[in-house]
From Swiss-Prot:
PTM notes: Undergoes a tyrosination/detyrosination cycle, the cyclic removal and re-addition of a C-terminal tyrosine residue by the enzymes tubulin tyrosine carboxypeptidase (TTCP) and tubulin tyrosine ligase (TTL), respectively. Acetylation of alpha chains at Lys-40 stabilizes microtubules and affects affinity and processivity of microtubule motors. This modification has a role in multiple cellular functions, ranging from cell motility, cell cycle progression or cell differentiation to intracellular trafficking and signaling.
Keywords: Acetylation, Cytoplasm, Cytoskeleton, GTP-binding, Hydrolase, Magnesium, Metal-binding, Microtubule, Nucleotide-binding
UniProt organism field: Homarus americanus (American lobster)
PROSITE patterns on file: TUBULIN
Residues bearing the modification N6-acetyllysine: 40
Predominant subcellular localization, coarse grouping: cytoplasm
Task of the protein: Tubulin is the major constituent of microtubules, a cylinder consisting of laterally associated linear protofilaments composed of alpha- and beta-tubulin heterodimers. Microtubules grow by the addition of GTP-tubulin dimers to the microtubule end, where a stabilizing cap forms. Below the cap, tubulin dimers are in GDP-bound state, owing to GTPase activity of alpha-tubulin.
Site (Involved in polymerization): 451
EC assignment: 3.6.5.-
Co-factor(s): Mg(2+)
Gene3D superfamilies: Helix hairpin bin, Tubulin/FtsZ, C-terminal domain, Tubulin/FtsZ, GTPase domain
Superkingdom assignment: Eukaryota
Binding site for Mg(2+): 71
Protein's name according to its UniProt entry: Tubulin alpha-1 chain
Length: 451
């Protein structure tokens, strides 16, 4: 059995966790009290959804997940919410005082008091697995817990479970909608620390998702619930192949093999289609070709950047629902003829395709329409360097004046860590730039007219 353990850190991680597990439960027909009427083989754990749920003798299905926050209020909502019976009380771990948007508190002072409890709990979950394949870590870059505690936890997971994959779902600080002034600091510190410990990180930019909700779902003022439900759909599409039997089952290591050409370049861009409200879906026919084309629209991306300015290194299309390979091949051939997509010259224009026959599920009463087919595209493109450049620029503006730095130093950090982290991100931008250069550029500049 190839189990995955989900770890939800900080407010963003926990709230994404709520949306994701709510959707998983609906998809698998698991009730809020963890019972699963459709599961006839009680106690037999060979069903594919057992990668994400463990089955108890009493026929309950418990998520293989841990929720961690350094302050209790957000996790308390889970403890008293609709799904309170779904989780084991020990899976919900909280501290007493929060990280106050401060990476140093999450990573050093407050985080280190709770990290052993969390690792113990993860160890217990790992012991219940027959063949653990890895961890999915949900967090934000901007918060103190999401940035500081996550990076501490990832370091420790690398020590304890060296060879296991670690995939992140990270909320990237939105350019316009910032919840904290120091988000650029936290983001850059956490990226620097986790860069070598993470195998693949799917970034989600709040602002991009705001725009999608506003534009495609006609929600004037999207709430976090709207955002998280949309993120839930995306996570569900990415993990569907692990939870259902499909024509092409992608496991965690397969993601890395196909999307990550170099260890540091592990930030795929996620695009999901169709995001459409019920009123519109009624009047539109969403064919395979249409949803595939929608994936190449910058407007449907989860991070604000323009792939038309970058080059693709790899591309995965994960379809679910009523989709046949013939339609997919036609859609891809059509896209290749348009040639709006530029691949790097050292990578053949390969699209990896996964088809899963389980149709997309929607949360009842939510904003998304029920559709018969959907697609999630994961592409590794050099355009995502734009996102890093934006963040680095903000970091520089503040750090030039050493604004807010004393809060970090006061919690036991050294100023050198800031410079070190910033240099690492400069190197990351450079890496992206080099990867996008044509391999012929280096040797011979004149022969530029072989088009």
């Amino acid at each position: 059995m190839r189990e995955c353990i989900s770890i939800h850190v900080g407010q963003a991680g926990v709230q994404m966790g709520n949306a994701v597990w709510e959707l998983y439960c609906l998809e698998h027909g698991i009730q809020p009290d963890a019972k699963m009427p459709s599961d006839k083989t009680v106690g037999v754990s060979d069903d594919s959804f057992n990668t994400f749920f463990s089955e108890t003798g009493a026929g309950k299905h418990v998520p293989r997940a841990v929720f961690v926050d350094l302050e209790p209020s957000v996790v308390d909502e889970v403890r008293s919410g609709v799904y309170r019976q779904l989780f084991h009380p020990e899976q919900l771990i909280t501290g007493k005082e929060d990280a106050a948007n401060n990476y140093a508190r999450g990573h050093y002072t407050i985080g280190k008091e709770i990290v052993d409890i969390v690792l113990d709990r993860i160890r217990k979950l790992a012991d219940q697995c027959t063949g653990l394949q890895g961890f999915l870590i949900f967090h934000s870059f901007g918060g103190g817990t999401g940035s500081g505690f996550t990076s501490l936890l990832m370091e420790r997971l690398s020590v304890d479970y060296g060879k296991k994959s670690k995939l992140e779902f990270a909320v990237y600080p939105a350019p316009q909608v910032a919840t904290a002034v120091v988000e650029p600091y936290n983001s850059i510190l956490t990226t620097h620390t986790t860069l070598e410990h993470s195998d693949c990180a799917f970034m989600v930019d709040n602002e991009a998702i705001y725009d999608i909700c506003r534009r495609n779902l006609d929600i004037e003022r999207p709430s976090y619930t709207n955002l998280n439900r949309l993120i839930g759909q995306i996570v569900s599409s990415i993990t569907a192949s692990l939870r259902f039997d499909g024509a092409l089952n992608v496991d965690l290591t397969e993601f890395q093999t196909n999307l990550v050409p170099y260890p540091r370049i592990h930030f795929p861009l996620v695009t999901y289609a169709p995001v459409i409200s019920a009123e519109k879906a009624y009047h539109e026919q969403l064919s395979v070709a249409e949803i595939t084309n929608a994936c190449f629209e910058p407007a449907n991306q989860m991070v604000k950047c323009d792939p038309r300015h970058g080059k693709y290194m790899a591309c995965c299309l994960l379809y679910r629902g009523d989709v046949v390979p013939k339609d997919v091949n036609a859609a891809i051939a059509n896209i290749k003829t348009k040639r709006t997509i530029q691949f790097v010259d050292w990578c053949p224009t390969g699209f990896k395709v996964g088809i899963n026959y389980q149709p997309p599920t929607v949360v009842p009463g939510a904003d998304l329409a029920k559709v018969s087919r959907a697609v999630c595209m994961l592409s590794n493109t050099t355009a995502i360097a734009e996102a890093w450049a934006r963040l680095d620029h903000k970091f520089d503006l503040m750090y030039a004046k050493r604004a807010f730095v004393h809060w970090y130093v006061g919690e036991g950090m050294e100023e050198g860590e800031f410079t070190e982290a910033r240099e690492d991100l400069a190197a990351l931008e450079k890496d992206y730039e080099e990867v996008g250069m044509d391999s012929a550029d280096g040797e011979d500049i004149e022969g530029g007219d072989e088009y």
